[in-house]
Amino acid sequence: MIHMTDTFEKTYTDWSIDVGEYKYEGITLKEVEQNLYSIQDNDMDFLIVSPSKAISVGNKLYNFVQVCSDQHTELLHIEISVTNDGEQGAIIYGKNELGHQEVLQIIEDFIAHHKVPTLDDWEIVLDLRPKMESYVKGTEND
């Protein structure tokens, strides 16, 4: 039986943490958790956790997860960058007012199990896709 601590202490070598001042590869979920506390304490502005190669789930590629503080609250704001299969440019989905544990769970699922949340109730924060979609896709709209 695998205990929580195994996943927690394990080093995920093909993942990196970027907090602005520094970035390093080979991360543990324990470090992720400590960084989340730092954000909540306003010692740190943001945290980006990214795989060396985007994670493919379904027909989407998941590029990175970013966490920052939810303004004026003790809570956290999380964003996930997603690219649809065959498309250029990512869509950034965001969710506000999440607790520490919820955010950690999302990141743990992503890193340890390559599982991602359903983004139906997340808002689109930024759409970085080129605006020429119908042209690129060709005859779909005819």
Which stretches of residues belong to each language-model region?
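A short glycine-rich, His/Asp/Glu-containing loop-to-beta-strand
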Residues: L47-V49
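Acidic, proline/glycine-rich low-complexity IDRs
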Residues: M1-M44, I55-D142
